[in-house]
Amino acid sequence: MEDIQSHKDYRNIDIDQVGVKGIRYPITVLDKDLGEQQTVAKINMYVNLPRYGEQQTVAKINMYVNLPRYYKGTHMSRFVEILNEHSHRVSLQNFSEILEEMKLRLNAQSAHMEITFPYFINKTAPVSGSQGLMEYKCTFRGSLNERTDLVVAIQVPVSTLCPCSKEISDFGAHNQRGEVRVQLRFKKFVWIEDIIKLVEASASSDVYSVLKREDEKYVTERAYNNPMFVEDIVRDIAMKLNKDRNITWFSVEAENFESIHNHNAYAYIEKHKNS
């Protein structure tokens, strides 16, 4: 059959990224406590991950390659074929391998893949010991030109209490949920759980899925005794990441969903570290 995609295109324009977007696909990711975790990710293809315990999940995946000006189109089916050949074992360890295969099979100079998935941790309430699953949105994003560039991104819900409100009020202080988004480049493998714990320790308090009354008392009092601006959160996290020699680049952003204002509070730090 005639291969239309390989026909010559006369507009003489390169395409930076072309491929498949929004594939929902079951994957297995490493779980530090349980072993592997199976999850569902939304995948955009580019590549790399390791092994321990495992958790199954569903990912949303995007996979792209560049398209030179002299080709009319790319072969979309090959992206999914490459994904299927890895039999759900998409991870940081084989991310680079998948990117290399994309470049080879699609005759491309560059490849890019994004895998976004919910990651679950069974979290224990601080006093009662009640347990409940917490969901964290994670993304593995990688590109391959001459070499592989891999970024891990994690979103962590937190609770914050306003230092100014506490200082000026006779009773209580305004508090709210917030979200911290961390992106990392690194030399060796990083655990999702370790980054989540680092972030949660830098907020006024953790967020939990299950709390009994004694837990609520503990959480609200802890937040009151540990007030934080968004500026405090990003600075504290940046200090910790800056001390980690495994991290080569990071960005940290904190956003508070303000409870008494008609806007959110926001802060951002980015740092390229010397290798």
Question: Language-model segments: which ranges?
Answer:
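N-terminal intrinsically disordered, cationic/polar leader segments
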Residues: M1-S275
